[in-house]
Amino acid sequence: MTARSCRNYENDFMSTTIDGSQFPAQGSFAIVVSRYNDSVTRRLLDGAVDTLHAAGISEESIQIAWVPGAWEIPLVAAQFARQSGIDAVICL
């Protein structure tokens, strides 16, 4: 049996931190939120909207769609992604 080396994740891409200052202060954003586990997803939505506002995104530039559960998220996200006026889709 030979010894295995452990992978060093120190310089891996997943260690990169992206903060709100890297968002453009313009654009239209869609947020798709699952109603399932509402007590969690509402708080995630609040955090996402607060982060967009902190980056200078106006309330008018944010569209929110509630869906019943996780299965519907990709369907609605794909519809938003096909719209020419949406710059990013956030799925919660």
Locate each region found by the language model.
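Generic N-terminal initiation segments characterized by hydrophobic and/or small/turn-forming residues
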Residues: 10-11, 49, 89
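Short, Lys/Arg-enriched N-terminal segments with co-localized hydrophobic residues
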Residues: 1-13
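Residue-identity detector for threonine
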Residues: 2, 16-17, 41, 51
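Glycine-rich phosphate/diphosphate-binding loop of Rossmann-like nucleotide-binding domains
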Residues: 22-68
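Glycine-rich phosphate-binding loop
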Residues: 76-92
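Structural motif
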Residues: 67-78
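Glutamate identity and glutamate-enriched acidic tracts
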Residues: 10, 59-60, 72
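Anion-binding alpha/beta catalytic cores of soluble intermediary-metabolism enzymes, centered on
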Residues: 10-33, 40, 77, 83
